[in-house]
């Protein structure tokens, strides 16, 4: 049992040493998203007025 622990220790030691010695990767620069398209910035269309005209004219008849 003692030999097994010793073998595991010997096998794990290089992994631990190499992990501590390696440099962490450089952070990725934050990329600014592009500006939204122009059609998104326009006001929403007014659907209420045309629908009121359709509904009122059908109620009269």
UniProtKB/Swiss-Prot annotation:
GO biological process: viral release from host cell by cytolysis
Main location group: host cell
GO cellular component, one term: membrane
Cited InterPro entries: O-spanin
Signal peptide positions (record): 1-19
Lipid-conjugated positions (S-diacylglycerol cysteine): 20
Pfam family, one: Rz1
Domain of life: Viruses
Lipidation feature positions (N-palmitoyl cysteine): 20
Keywords attached to this entry: Cytolysis, Disulfide bond, Host cell lysis by virus, Host cell outer membrane, Host membrane, Lipoprotein, Membrane, Palmitate, Signal, Viral release from host cell
UniProt subcellular location: Host cell outer membrane
Keyword presence, Lipoprotein: yes
Function comment: Component of the spanin complex that disrupts the host outer membrane and causes cell lysis during virus exit. The spanin complex conducts the final step in host lysis by disrupting the outer membrane after holin and endolysin action have permeabilized the inner membrane and degraded the host peptidoglycans.
Name recorded for this polypeptide: Spanin, outer membrane subunit
Gene this protein is translated from: Rz1
